[in-house]
From Swiss-Prot:
This is Dual-specificity RNA methyltransferase RlmN. It comes from Shewanella frigidimarina (strain NCIMB 400). Specifically methylates position 2 of adenine 2503 in 23S rRNA and position 2 of adenine 37 in tRNAs. m2A2503 modification seems to play a crucial role in the proofreading step occurring at the peptidyl transferase center and thus would serve to optimize ribosomal fidelity. CDD domains: Radical_SAM. The active site is at residues 94, 344. It is found in: Cytoplasm. Its EC number is 2.1.1.192. Residues 100-339 form the Radical SAM core domain. Its cofactor is [4Fe-4S] cluster.
Length: 373
């Protein structure tokens, strides 16, 4: 029976240094290896010519460097690319590359599915299977970098920003998300600025406190409603961590963070005649008055079976103007990749749902149909 090899993509620099120490090697070997993997895209130990032959042989016997494969991809008319990433056992997660004039952002998944059941999000309706490993999270960045033209000779990289806004709730997978983000920030990893790595959360407050103690990255928060009554429906985790508790956690995070420059990004999906009235805009402004923030209004992106519609441009404009009258900074997000279901809230992947959510929903729909007949 062969011994399972250690995937070195599962280890941040601290973990790699511990591994090399166990092998009787100097800690700086971890720095050398990371530079080969993340700066030059090399996964074959034999190509690492500043590591001696004996150590290369030891590494090959005990370790491997394996990123998940791209199963397929689609390119939008606006240049956005959606990747289906094979994470094994017949399952796929989705990763989205969004090129712009001044940046190139990769939207990364943290879980196979999602347990939070936000009612406006396609991923939330697919159910949940498992957390992604460190290698499956950082491997999305590595694999897409290779696909886009990672230059081994110069070390030039095509990704300037990473957002943990793909499938899953990152704060429910902190044990793997934090080391993955460490690699993104590490000078020997992807060497991204802490202001260019963003984690988005729906509000798992105890984990948000742990995040603030462990790492400093930009924070985006999914609010989506100006009061608990509506947010309980749209974002069910609100029943456990209501808005005032969430906002207090956000303020605690901001006190620890330099990456956010003192304010958080508030994400607010615009649902037609659900959360987009001028009264609700006033209510949102009052809610956020003690929390330094900028508001990102997100036009809803419909998906098959969605119960909601997108707010009209005129309703979004009115909502935005009310917020600005209260002195808030407001950005209306430009929709990208919606023609290939790669926009915010549309990611689904291929999930074997351990929660049986889709099956339960179908059963409920069948029962309703029988009753109506």
């Amino acid at each position: 029976m062969s011994v399972k090899k250690i995937n070195l993509l599962d280890l941040d620099r601290k973990g790699l240094r511990a591994l090399f120490s166990e092998m009787g090697e100097k800690p700086f070997r971890a720095d050398q290896l990371m530079k080969w993997v993340y700066h030059f895209g090399v996964t074959d130990f034999e190509e690492m010519n500043n590591i001696n032959k004996v150590l290369r042989t030891k590494l090959a016997a005990k370790c491997e460097i394996v990123a998940p494969e791209i199963a397929s991809f689609q390119k939008s008319n606006d240049g956005t690319i959606k990747f289906a990433i094979n994470v094994g056992q017949g399952q796929e997660v989705e990763t989205v590359y969004i090129p712009e004039e001044d940046r190139a952002t990769l939207c990364v998944s943290s879980q196979v599915g999602c347990a939070l059941e936000c009612t406006f999000c396609s991923t939330g309706q697919q159910g949940f299977n498992r957390n992604l490993t460190v290698s499956e999270i950082i491997g999305q960045v590595w694999r897409v970098s290779q696909f886009l033209g990672f230059h081994k000779d110069t070390g030039d990289r095509p990704i300037s920003n990473v957002v943990m806004m793909g499938m899953g709730e990152p704060l429910l997978n902190l044990a793997n998300v934090i080391p993955a983000m460490d690699i993104m920030l590490d000078d020997f990893g992807f060497s991204l600025s802490k202001r260019r790595v963003t984690l988005s959360t729906s509000g798992v407050v105890p984990a948000l406190d742990k995040l603030g103690d462990a790492i400093d990255v930009a924070l985006a928060v999914s609010i989506h409603a100006p009061n608990d009554e509506l947010r309980d429906v749209l974002v069910p985790v609100n029943k456990k961590y209501p808005l005032q508790e969430f906002l207090a956690g956000i303020r605690r995070y901001l006190e620890k963070s330099n990456a956010n420059r003192g304010r958080v990004t508030v994400e607010y999906v615009m649902l037609d005649h659900i959360n987009d009235s001028t009264d609700q805009a006033h209510e949102l402004a009052i809610l956020m008055k003690d929390t330094p923030c900028k508001i990102n209004l997100i036009p809803f992106n419909p998906y098959p079976g969605s119960p909601y519609g997108r707010s009209s441009n005129s309703r979004i404009d009115r909502f935005s103007k009310v917020l600005m009258e209260h002195g808030l900074t407001v950005i209306v997000r430009k929709t990208r990749g919606d023609d290939i279901d790669a926009a915010c809230g549309q990611l689904a992947g291929d999930i074997r749902d351990r929660t049986k959510r889709l099956a339960k929903k179908q059963m409920q729909q069948n029962q309703i149909s029988v009753t109506m007949e």
